[in-house]
Amino acid sequence: MALDLVIRGGTVATAEKTFRADVGIQGERIVEIKENLKGNQTIDAAGKLVLPGGVDSHCHIEQLSGMGVMAADDFYSATVSAAHGGTTTVIPFCAQHRGDDLKKVLKDYHERARAKAVIDYGFHLIIANPDEQTLQSDLPQAIRSGVRSFKIFMTYDRMRLHDEQILDVMAAARREGALVMVHAENHGIISWLAGRMIKQGNTLPRYHAICHTRGSEAEAIERVIRLAELVDCPILIVHVSTPEGIEAIRSARRNGLKVYGETCPQYLFLTAKDIDIGLQGAMFCCSPPPRDEAAQEACWRGLKDGALHVYSSDHAPYRMDASGKLPKGDKTTFKEMANGVPGLELRLPLLFTYGYKQKRISLEEFVNLTATRHAQTYGLYPRKGTIAVGADADIAVWDPEKKLVIEKTRDNAGYTPYKGRSLTGWPVTVLSRGEVIVENGKLSAERGRGRFLAREPSEALKPLGREVPEISQLKAWNTPLQL
């Protein structure tokens, strides 16, 4: 019997291998991978690469920021942009601010995404109010509903947790089976420097990069690793930007700890020099900020040797006007600018061009860093993140020689920090669950076709079962620590 759809004659790549084969699709799933398949419909992939659709596990969509600014993208514009860039699954954040009821927060985000998303999605939680109700009732309920990861902040006045609160959240994650993601920067260092810069009249965006020091990231990463070790809680450090931070993660992993690292396009392709262009430098302001060429090289090494586990966009789109980056127009100080840069659409093409095409990484590593490890880490594998029999037919067919110069993207930020860069390689046909949703730059997906993905427990979030000496001593005394 003929299959519904066959992707014919392409070069298939997974995280393990690259090979020539047809990919046969029945309904929403991949059902056969071999040569000479017959289908009612075919996609000619001769001379092209057939890759898993990207999984972006760090993006901010229709979310109020820690500074109280709404992201420029809703779930429609963001997922349309993602799809055009070859990403077929996103895991954005449901943000709890202080005083927010976690159940209501999650309900609100479900309603937003259900009505608008054109690709499949999961959720992380942002925990800013770790009271007893949140930790003992609301969080366990959310985890059981398939939201198995949450993010905490060590900086931002509205969001940051102190060390005891972080330990409370980690203990809950360990009990319930969830992964803790950490924005690791030392709040005191940043706040102290920023206060003095503003007082001295140094208000331009370039001072943002000065205040968010390399040391503030390194210290916070080292500290949160120690906290996680105390309660045996796996953690993932998001948007790592410094050689010192990467080395702290590398050292922890060398010691057998479950500490994962993530980096993003802005730390591979931007530097602090991009910010130093007057007020327009706000376009490049994110936290932590881009660093220098040496830090870029450290990030590339981390991706190559595994210290950095995944490559995400940290898509945080804010317009260059009073609604986003410049709430006070040209009087806006760096402390008042919304932090973040758009990146959902260009995450994959940038890494393809400057990673794979320039031989910094292999094609298999490209797939691993952009899709497979995300799915494995966050409980979506093997349904997502690979090309395999039984997997969802989330596939991007890439023309590896297609050349273009970045001018604009399909998100709602109104700018891209990568404008003017040349790309070689672009996804020309994108499928989500067997449906062609993008072809040659044209969208054919209906608003709201995306589905929520309840995530399963993954190997990444399982505790090691390893104790620090003091916890072992408590057991020896028959007075074990109660998490």
Model-flagged regions — what are they?
Residues 10, 28, 47, 58, ...:
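Divalent metal-coordination and catalytic microenvironments
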Residues 1-53, 67:
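Histidine-rich, glycine-flanked metal-binding segment
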Residues 45-116:
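Metal-associated gating/positioning segment near the N- to mid-region
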Residues 136-311, 316:
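Histidine/acidic residue-rich metal-binding segments in metalloenzymes
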Residues 103-119, 168-182:
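Alpha-helix-loop-beta-strand connector modules within alpha/beta enzyme cores
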Residues 325-333, 389-453:
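C-terminal cap of metal-dependent C-N hydrolases
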Residues 59-73, 122-135, 210-214:
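Active-site mouth loops of central-metabolism enzymes
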Residues 205-234, 281-283, 309-310, 317-402:
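His/Asp/Glu-enriched, well-ordered alpha-helical/loop segment
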